[in-house]
């Protein structure tokens, strides 16, 4: 059963599936689709060509699907796509994509996005991430699965943060953060391996050791980057936990933190 507060303003063209709950004074635009059993708190605003999956929980004053903060945007029908089982807390802002990017902003499944976080246009967020309060992404940022962003983390446009990586409080990410690694500092630098996150997600001691050796190869052995990368890619052919480095290196446009 869909439950809509009488003060909510929902365009007749919006599509709400069964079990959706909408709180007081929330506004939902005409091109919005909301999946089953998603709960939307009071005073939220959902606009644009926005698709939201099932079993999400969206808190009060969230702003989803507004136009991107890009002066080149000319009201093109770009999109915001949100998956299933996400928690989206108070005062978060997720913008539509742009035609100069991929045309959509995408959020996967089971993400925990805390208050005041900002996801700019054309960002792609994986699954099972945690964004602590006030983490902000510029446009075209890619965040992998199981990433943890510390509070007030700022990520520069076009940066990538690999699977299972973690940033410290107020990290300023200006280059790509490889999978499994931690980053900290105003101009983020390598800060070790996210070994605790790996353990919590079922990695064995042997797998963690293999990734730790990758970290040492990149940062502690004095090897030129291209030589270190070639060595890591060779190892990735036989070690499954290192396979993520193949795609990461291939798709990196800004270079990695050093």
From Swiss-Prot:
Superkingdom of this protein's organism: Bacteria
Annotated InterPro entries: Acetyltransf_C, Acetyltransf_C_sf, Hexapep, Lipid_A_LpxA, Trimer_LpxA-like_sf
Reactions performed catalytically: a (3R)-hydroxyacyl-[ACP] + UDP-N-acetyl-alpha-D-glucosamine = a UDP-3-O-[(3R)-3-hydroxyacyl]-N-acetyl-alpha-D-glucosamine + holo-[ACP]
Compartments where found: Cytoplasm
The keyword Lipid metabolism is annotated on this UniProt entry: yes
Main location: cytoplasm
Keywords: Acyltransferase, Cytoplasm, Lipid A biosynthesis, Lipid biosynthesis, Lipid metabolism, Repeat, Transferase
Pfam families in the record: Acetyltransf_11 (PF13720), Hexapep (PF00132)
Listed GO biological process terms: lipid A biosynthetic process
Pathway as given in its UniProt record: Glycolipid biosynthesis; lipid IV(A) biosynthesis; lipid IV(A) from (3R)-3-hydroxytetradecanoyl-[acyl-carrier-protein] and UDP-N-acetyl-alpha-D-glucosamine: step 1/6
SUPFAM superfamilies for this protein: Trimeric LpxA-like enzymes
GO annotations of cellular component type: cytoplasm; membrane
Enzyme class (EC, first level): transferase
EC number: 2.3.1.129
Subunit structure: Homotrimer.
PANTHER family (UniProt xref): ACYL-[ACYL-CARRIER-PROTEIN]--UDP-N-ACETYLGLUCOSAMINE O-ACYLTRANSFERASE, ACYL-[ACYL-CARRIER-PROTEIN]--UDP-N-ACETYLGLUCOSAMINE O-ACYLTRANSFERASE, MITOCHONDRIAL-RELATED
Described function: Involved in the biosynthesis of lipid A, a phosphorylated glycolipid that anchors the lipopolysaccharide to the outer membrane of the cell.
Entry similarity comment: Belongs to the transferase hexapeptide repeat family. LpxA subfamily.
HAMAP family to which the protein is assigned, alphabetical: LpxA
Name this polypeptide is given: Acyl-[acyl-carrier-protein]--UDP-N-acetylglucosamine O-acyltransferase
């Amino acid at each position: 059963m869909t439950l809509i507060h009488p003060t909510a303003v929902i365009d007749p063209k919006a599509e709400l599936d069964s079990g959706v709950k909408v709180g007081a004074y929330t506004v939902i635009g005409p091109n919005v689709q909301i999946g089953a059993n998603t709960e939307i708190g009071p005073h939220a605003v959902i606009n644009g060509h926005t698709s939201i999956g099932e079993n999400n929980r969206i808190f009060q004053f969230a702003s989803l699907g507004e136009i991107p903060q890009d002066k080149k945007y000319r009201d093109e029908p770009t999109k915001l796509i949100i998956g299933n089982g996400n928690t989206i807390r108070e005062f978060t802002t997720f913008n539509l994509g742009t035609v100069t990017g991929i045309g959509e902003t995408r959020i996967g499944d089971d993400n925990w996005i805390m208050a005041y976080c900002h996801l700019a246009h054309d960002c792609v967020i994986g699954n099972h991430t945690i964004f602590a309060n006030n983490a902000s992404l510029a446009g075209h940022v890619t965040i992998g699965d199981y990433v943890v962003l510390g509070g007030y983390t700022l990520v520069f446009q076009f940066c990538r943060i690999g699977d299972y990586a973690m940033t410290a409080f107020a990290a300023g990410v200006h280059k790509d953060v490889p999978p499994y690694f931690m980053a900290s500092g105003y101009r983020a630098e390598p800060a070790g391996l996210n070994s605790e996150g790996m353990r919590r997600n079922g990695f064995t001691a042997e797998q963690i050791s293999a990734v730790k050796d990758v970290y040492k190869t990149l940062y502690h052995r004095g090897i030129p980057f291209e030589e270190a990368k070639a060595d890591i890619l060779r190892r990735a052919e036989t070690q499954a936990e290192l396979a993520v480095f193949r795609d990461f290196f291939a798709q990196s446009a800004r270079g990695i933190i050093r």
